[in-house]
């Protein structure tokens, strides 16, 4: 019997529930149903999301705002490329640098102290992610207003969704964190990120996700990736079944240099994606083979069940037939027994046979259907019913019959009917002292 909470499920939802439980191995049916309901009963998305959760990757369809972003950044093999700002050149450059140094130091010190003190007054609003997609769209619009519409295609979704799409499609994910207050951000966006050759490389080889660290979603990603300076780029890919940072690019980098660094990172890690594709194909083939085996097993099971059903039906048919034959035999035996008892009763009720010397006696010779003859005497005053009872009591007589006289040829009314409620006597029927009567078999009529 289905559990009460499963009674409102359709047949299709029940099948998806059982299939999801089989694929994920979750024992709790309530948990399976809750997960499917979160994904609008999209079983493919629910299974993928379950696998992502097992590997520590946030959910694509319901990413919790407060959950830390699970990306492997502790790999010591991460390729890191940092571009330092150029040192001042010449007497004029060093003079300008030394003059501005106290002002910059004072400005950034006061700014840091102000931000630190502000945290005690009210929490950093960036720590609460309420609309991550809105943060992405807002940054994209501000980017286009400031630097134009010629830029790499922005991934219009949350960071978690970008990770999951890159994982599902086995593609590189390039993450750009924009520091609005950094002095190199404008030059990088305008001259490097929007360069045609950079746009072409990013759009054809990878997914591109970007956000400002002033936005809650960008700040959350910044806390996970721990950048040191801006502009900051991180290359992420599926490695050892986890989304892993395989490259970090920090500082003001030129277009050609950026292309070279990205190409180097992709070439160095391409084997991991190839290996993952092969493993995924092998898993898919194994799954297809298992599905085919399951289908073959189910087909064989259905065939066996059909055979068993037909056998049961045949056994049931034979049983009913045998039972019907047995009932017919019993009914026939009861009928014969009742018939024999009726014959014996009729025989016991017959009046005594008159003597041959009795002038009122009638000698009747009966010709039975089996060509045998029976002779008996009756009294003229007796009803024709007595003749019928006598013949009925005989072992040779049929079960149903009528008595016919030959001259003139007529049927004697021996049993009550509408025409003869009270059958006549032998004398009233016009019988003589010696008669030959014929017994006509009516059993089959």
Swiss-Prot record:
<dbReference type="InterPro" id="IPR001012">
    <property type="entry name" value="UBX_dom"/>
</dbReference>
<dbReference type="GO" id="GO:0034098">
    <property type="term" value="C:VCP-NPL4-UFD1 AAA ATPase complex"/>
</dbReference>
<keyword id="KW-0175">Coiled coil</keyword>
<comment type="function">
    <text>Plays an important role in endoplasmic reticulum-associated degradation (ERAD) that mediates ubiquitin-dependent degradation of misfolded endoplasmic reticulum proteins. By controlling the steady-state expression of the IGF1R receptor, indirectly regulates the insulin-like growth factor receptor signaling pathway. Involved in inhibition of lipid droplet degradation by binding to phospholipase PNPL2 and inhibiting its activity by promoting dissociation of PNPL2 from its endogenous activator, ABHD5 which inhibits the rate of triacylglycerol hydrolysis.</text>
</comment>
<dbReference type="GO" id="GO:0043161">
    <property type="term" value="P:proteasome-mediated ubiquitin-dependent protein catabolic process"/>
</dbReference>
<feature type="modified residue" description="N6-acetyllysine">
    <location>
        <position position="167"/>
    </location>
</feature>
<dbReference type="InterPro" id="IPR009060">
    <property type="entry name" value="UBA-like_sf"/>
</dbReference>
<feature type="compositionally biased region" description="Basic and acidic residues">
    <location>
        <begin position="303"/>
        <end position="348"/>
    </location>
</feature>
<dbReference type="InterPro" id="IPR050730">
    <property type="entry name" value="UBX_domain-protein"/>
</dbReference>
<dbReference type="GO" id="GO:0035578">
    <property type="term" value="C:azurophil granule lumen"/>
</dbReference>
<feature type="domain" description="UBX">
    <location>
        <begin position="357"/>
        <end position="439"/>
    </location>
</feature>
<keyword id="KW-0963">Cytoplasm</keyword>
<dbReference type="GO" id="GO:0043130">
    <property type="term" value="F:ubiquitin binding"/>
</dbReference>
<dbReference type="Pfam" id="PF00789">
    <property type="entry name" value="UBX"/>
</dbReference>
<dbReference type="InterPro" id="IPR006577">
    <property type="entry name" value="UAS"/>
</dbReference>
<keyword id="KW-0551">Lipid droplet</keyword>
<dbReference type="GO" id="GO:0036503">
    <property type="term" value="P:ERAD pathway"/>
</dbReference>
<dbReference type="GO" id="GO:0005811">
    <property type="term" value="C:lipid droplet"/>
</dbReference>
<dbReference type="InterPro" id="IPR054109">
    <property type="entry name" value="UBA_8"/>
</dbReference>
<feature type="modified residue" description="N-acetylalanine">
    <location>
        <position position="2"/>
    </location>
</feature>
<dbReference type="InterPro" id="IPR036249">
    <property type="entry name" value="Thioredoxin-like_sf"/>
</dbReference>
<dbReference type="GO" id="GO:0031625">
    <property type="term" value="F:ubiquitin protein ligase binding"/>
</dbReference>
<dbReference type="Pfam" id="PF21021">
    <property type="entry name" value="FAF1"/>
</dbReference>
<feature type="coiled-coil region">
    <location>
        <begin position="275"/>
        <end position="350"/>
    </location>
</feature>
<keyword id="KW-0007">Acetylation</keyword>
<dbReference type="GO" id="GO:0005576">
    <property type="term" value="C:extracellular region"/>
</dbReference>
<feature type="region of interest" description="Disordered">
    <location>
        <begin position="299"/>
        <end position="361"/>
    </location>
</feature>
<feature type="domain" description="UBA">
    <location>
        <begin position="12"/>
        <end position="48"/>
    </location>
</feature>
<dbReference type="GO" id="GO:0055102">
    <property type="term" value="F:lipase inhibitor activity"/>
</dbReference>
<dbReference type="GO" id="GO:0005783">
    <property type="term" value="C:endoplasmic reticulum"/>
</dbReference>
<keyword id="KW-0834">Unfolded protein response</keyword>
<protein>
    <recommendedName>
        <fullName>FAS-associated factor 2</fullName>
    </recommendedName>
</protein>
<dbReference type="GO" id="GO:0030970">
    <property type="term" value="P:retrograde protein transport, ER to cytosol"/>
</dbReference>
<dbReference type="InterPro" id="IPR029071">
    <property type="entry name" value="Ubiquitin-like_domsf"/>
</dbReference>
<dbReference type="GO" id="GO:0035617">
    <property type="term" value="P:stress granule disassembly"/>
</dbReference>
<dbReference type="GO" id="GO:0034389">
    <property type="term" value="P:lipid droplet organization"/>
</dbReference>
<comment type="subunit">
    <text>Identified in a complex that contains SEL1L, OS9, FAF2/UBXD8, UBE2J1/UBC6E and AUP1. Interacts with YOD1. Interacts (via N-terminus) with UBQLN2 (via C-terminus). Interacts with PNPLA2 and UBAC2. Interacts with ZFAND2B; probably through VCP. Interacts with LMBR1L.</text>
</comment>
<dbReference type="InterPro" id="IPR049483">
    <property type="entry name" value="FAF1_2-like_UAS"/>
</dbReference>
<dbReference type="GO" id="GO:0035473">
    <property type="term" value="F:lipase binding"/>
</dbReference>
<dbReference type="GO" id="GO:0006986">
    <property type="term" value="P:response to unfolded protein"/>
</dbReference>
<keyword id="KW-0256">Endoplasmic reticulum</keyword>
<dbReference type="Pfam" id="PF22566">
    <property type="entry name" value="UBA_8"/>
</dbReference>
């Amino acid at each position: 019997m289905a559990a009460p909470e499963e009674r409102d499920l359709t047949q299709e939802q029940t099948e998806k529930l059982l299939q999801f439980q089989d694929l994920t191995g979750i024992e709790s049916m309530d948990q399976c149903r809750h997960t499917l309901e979160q994904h609008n009963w999209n079983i493919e998305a629910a299974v993928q999301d379950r696998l992502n959760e097992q590997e520590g990757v946030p959910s694509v369809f319901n990413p919790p705002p407060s959950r830390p972003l699970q990306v492997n950044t502790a790999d010591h093999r991460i390729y890191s490329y940092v571009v330092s700002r150029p040192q001042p050149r010449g007497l004029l450059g060093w003079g300008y640098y030394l003059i501005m140094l106290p002002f910059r130091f004072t400005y950034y010190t006061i700014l840091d102290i102000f931000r630190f003190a502000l945290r005690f007054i009210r929490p950093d609003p960036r720590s609460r992610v309420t609309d991550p997609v809105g943060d992405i769209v807002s940054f994209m619009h501000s980017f286009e207003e400031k630097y134009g519409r010629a830029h790499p295609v922005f991934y219009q979704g949350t960071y978690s969704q970008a990770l999951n799409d890159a994982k599902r499609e086995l593609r590189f994910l390039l993450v750009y964190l924009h520091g609005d207050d950094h002095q190199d951000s404008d030059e990088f966006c305008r001259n490097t990120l929007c360069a045609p050759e950079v746009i072409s490389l990013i759009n054809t080889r990878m997914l591109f996700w970007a956000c400002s660290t002033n936005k809650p979603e960008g700040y959350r990603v910044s806390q996970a990736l721990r950048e040191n300076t801006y502009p900051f780029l991180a290359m992420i890919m599926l490695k050892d079944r986890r989304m892993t940072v395989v490259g970090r690019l920090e500082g003001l980098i030129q277009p050609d240099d950026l292309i070279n660094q990205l190409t180097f990172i992709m070439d160095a890690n391409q084997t991991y994606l190839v290996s993952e594709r092969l493993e995924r194909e092998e898993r898919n083939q194994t799954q297809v083979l298992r599905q085919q085996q399951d289908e073959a097993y189910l087909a064989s099971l259905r065939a066996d069940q059909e055979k068993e059903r037909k056998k049961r039906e045949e056994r049931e048919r034979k049983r009913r037939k045998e039972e019907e034959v047995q009932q017919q035999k019993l009914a026939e035996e009861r009928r014969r027994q009742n018939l024999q008892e009726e014959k014996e009763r009729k025989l016991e009720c017959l009046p005594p046979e008159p003597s041959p010397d009795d002038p009122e006696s009638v000698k009747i010779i009966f010709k039975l259907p089996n060509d045998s003859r029976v002779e008996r005497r009756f009294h003229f005053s007796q009803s024709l019913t007595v003749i019928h009872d006598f013949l009925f009591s005989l072992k040779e007589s049929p079960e149903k019959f009528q008595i016919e006289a030959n001259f003139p040829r007529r049927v004697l009314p021996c049993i009550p009917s509408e025409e003869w409620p009270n059958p006549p006597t032998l004398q009233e029927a016009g019988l003589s002292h010696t008669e030959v009567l014929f017994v006509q078999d009516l059993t089959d009529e």
